[in-house]
Amino acid sequence: MSAATDEILEKLKSLTLLEAAELVKQIEETFGVSAAAPVGGMMVAAPVAGAAAAPAEEVEEKTAFDVILEEVPADKKIAVLKVVRSLTGLGLKEAKEVVESTPKPVKEGASKEDAEAAKKELEEAGAKVSIK
């Protein structure tokens, strides 16, 4: 590795969890990307021979789902906050912002199973959740 990348890596190692979350947010905003890990592997472009069949396959079934936190009753905020933190790995401040600024995506690009599991956990904690 080059000296520049070594230096960046060392600085990243010294970040607190809160600073790392802020860094991720800034990178997402600056470069217009999402840090959500793709569940189910990378999407690969269809071969040229199968290009005509590709659009029909995409219509058949959606593979990436977003879990949207729609509403949180005031008396359930703490329970929902704990679930949001466990699902996302966010710090307390970031998770609180998500819970208090509904509707807000909690998980993006999740598999159907993961999205359903997250929805179930959030609903058990008292939140109103949708999957898109």
From Swiss-Prot:
Biased composition (Basic and acidic residues): 100-126
GO biological process terms on file: translation
Disordered: region residues: 100-132
Keywords in alphabetical order: Ribonucleoprotein, Ribosomal protein
SUPFAM superfamilies: ClpS-like, Ribosomal protein L7/12, oligomerisation (N-terminal) domain
Keyword Cytoplasm part of the UniProt annotation: no
MF term (GO), any: mRNA binding
A GO CC term attached to the entry: cytosolic large ribosomal subunit
Keyword Cell inner membrane: no
Pfam families noted in UniProt: Ribosomal_L12 (PF00542), Ribosomal_L12_N (PF16320)
NCBIfam families xref list: L12 (TIGR00855)
Assembly description: Homodimer. Part of the ribosomal stalk of the 50S ribosomal subunit. Forms a multimeric L10(L12)X complex, where L10 forms an elongated spine to which 2 to 4 L12 dimers bind in a sequential fashion. Binds GTP-bound translation factors.
Entry similarity comment: Belongs to the bacterial ribosomal protein bL12 family.
Function: Forms part of the ribosomal stalk which helps the ribosome interact with GTP-bound translation factors. Is thus essential for accurate translation.
Protein name, entry field: Large ribosomal subunit protein bL12
Organismal lineage: Bacteria, Bacillati, Cyanobacteriota, Cyanophyceae, Acaryochloridales
Gene this protein is translated from: rplL
